[in-house]
């Protein structure tokens, strides 16, 4: 199963995340199928490749709870359903 989850990167205590499509059996920082965006929790900065995310969701990818809340803030699910 394909999951949309956060991949950790950055320096210690200055962590950022990439939003990636990855096989659910892979490690958190394993090789992703596709990088779909960026999230920095310190500044609350988010950059998303919305068309690619919508495509992955329509293919059946399941977002984790954290990624789901990021996508809800960006109103990505409205584009999937409508």
UniProtKB/Swiss-Prot annotation:
Q: Does the keyword Ribonucleoprotein apply?
A: yes
Q: Which UniProt keywords apply?
A: Ribonucleoprotein, Ribosomal protein
* Keyword Ribosomal protein among record annotations: yes
Question: Which biological process terms from the Gene Ontology are attached to this UniProt entry?
Answer: translation
InterPro entries assigned to the protein according to its UniProt record, in alphabetical order:
Ribosomal_bS16 (IPR000307), Ribosomal_bS16_dom_sf (IPR023803)
Quote the protein name from its UniProt record. Answer: Small ribosomal subunit protein bS16
Organism field: Crocosphaera subtropica (strain ATCC 51142 / BH68)
Q: What does UniProt give as GO cellular component? A: cytoplasm; small ribosomal subunit
As for family, the record states:
Belongs to the bacterial ribosomal protein bS16 family.
Which HAMAP family does the annotation name?
Ribosomal_bS16
Could you tell me which PANTHER family the record lists for this protein? 30S RIBOSOMAL PROTEIN S16, SMALL RIBOSOMAL SUBUNIT PROTEIN BS16M
Q: Which Gene3D superfamilies match?
A: 3.30.1320.10
**GO molecular function annotations of the record:** structural constituent of ribosome
Pfam families per record:
Ribosomal_S16
